[in-house]
């Protein structure tokens, strides 16, 4: 795990989680498997104030629970977890929106989730690499599963040059599970989550970097001889627009000079 991801979850913990001495917060880490002796979030939730459980689709270091169905965690009761965290996992998840629906289901009313996922970076399969998360990703995803998005941002510059992982342009989001006062609305919410989970399919087979067919083959043959951007019918309208923009700018500048006199 890169240090900037670790520090984002640490900041989430310090900003949002203030358990009282008599309350133990349950923490579920989705995608917790430690690859090649990587660091994990577990140390952030050690001690008597937290009860940490690492969930992943495969057994291994830092994994406490492997659900029988990767997208339907029947081993985790609904409304049973105070905090769900995840880092460097959602980009590998072929159906991340289903997993987010499960996050919403297992959270207690008012429970919190913090997820770190990249907005850039190279292909890295564990065993898949499906997605990147841009600034509009989390508002759309949280709205889909009924979570209240509290904050989100994609990292555009290093917060500290000593940290590793800036090249992933991580996107951190913090969201809260809804608290219902109307039983009908609550029932509809959980029914919708169940319907989303029911759309899951079998885990796909990992693909190759390129699966070439007739369209890509034809493109490869043509790309050195045809460039739509330099064809006259594509370029001329752009030239006209640029000329008009420059002429307008000159007119505005002349008007400003005239008024200043």
Identify the function of each model-found stretch.
Residues 1-21:
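Class I SAM-dependent methyltransferase Rossmann-like catalytic core
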Residues 94-244, 254:
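S-adenosyl-L-methionine-dependent methyltransferase catalytic module, highlighting the catalytic core
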């Amino acid at each position: 795990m890169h240090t900037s991801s670790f520090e984002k979850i640490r900041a989430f913990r310090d900003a949002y989680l203030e358990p009282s001495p008599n309350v133990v917060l349950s923490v579920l880490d989705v995608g917790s498997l430690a690859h090649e002796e990587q660091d994990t979030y577990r140390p952030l939730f050690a001690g008597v104030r937290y009860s940490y459980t690492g969930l992943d689709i495969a057994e291994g270091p830092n994994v406490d629970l492997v659900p029988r169905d990767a997208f339907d965690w029947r081993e985790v009761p609904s409304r049973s977890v105070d905090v769900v965290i995840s880092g460097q996992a959602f980009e590998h998840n072929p159906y991340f929106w289903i997993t987010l629906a499960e996050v919403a289901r297992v959270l207690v009313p008012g429970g919190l989730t913090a997820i770190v996922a990249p907005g850039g970076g190279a292909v890295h399969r564990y065993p898949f690499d499906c997605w990147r998360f841009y600034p509009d990703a989390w508002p759309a995803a949280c709205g889909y599963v009924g979570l209240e998005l509290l904050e989100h941002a994609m990292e555009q510059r290093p917060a500290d040059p000593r940290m590793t992982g800036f090249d992933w342009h991580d996107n951190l989001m913090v969201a809260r599970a809804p608290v219902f006062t109307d039983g009908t609305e609550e029932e509809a919410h959980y029914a919708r989550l169940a319907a989303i989970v029911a759309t899951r399919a079998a885990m796909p087979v990992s693909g190759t970097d390129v699966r070439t067919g007739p369209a890509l083959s034809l493109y490869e043959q043509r790309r050195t001889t045809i460039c739509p951007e330099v064809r006259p019918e594509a370029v001329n309208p752009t030239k006209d627009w640029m000329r008009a923009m420059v002429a307008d700018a000159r007119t505005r500048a002349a008007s400003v000079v005239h008024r200043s006199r």
